[in-house]
């Protein structure tokens, strides 16, 4: 068991998926879940965006562990930030003491690994499932293993992440910060989805309840967040739709959608 007074470094290399934004001014949900894991265990950590790291990098020495999130898989030009590159990820790994555990996660990590990147280092792990759940398992067992979060963990880490350093220490908090909420994961076209898209790979959609989402947003608002985007959805009208498994074209369910749209300031 990792002692609660040890310090981790969380490097937010940003995520940009077809249904999820995380490049500034957005703060992505996956990095918040990772922070939520540490918040739950009262483990000290430092949050750093990759853009801040480029300007004034925090020390990689004397760390209990390092987590690098690299989740930008949608080609694009960004106005306020630049996602972490493979070369930068390599540099972070090579400059970290070999005895320090490093966890790298996100869809970019999966893509780089698929292209043949497979660094050999005893205490380095490339997460191919949920980075947050993989970290949680490591903190419990001191062993690396691919893990998926369950629904209770999803809710807990989302709420804790809303008040984490990914929000309170975010450089854009008192500026244009937009808080990306994961409404659901997956795609209703999980059987015949677009071949170029990663969303069908997540399988049958898994919803979060409107109450769960509203509570998360309330926590974020208390931390100073003013702008929220309802993300993670491949299609707003398929949120909690009827016949997702049985029908090719699910029937929209307007009531839960309406509950979400009562949030004061949102982006869809």
Where are these regions (language model features)?
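A solvent-exposed, charged loop/short amphipathic helix patch at secondary-structure junctions
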Residues: 78-87, 197-198, 241-258
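Conserved alpha-helical substructure of the radical SAM core
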Residues: 200-232, 246-262
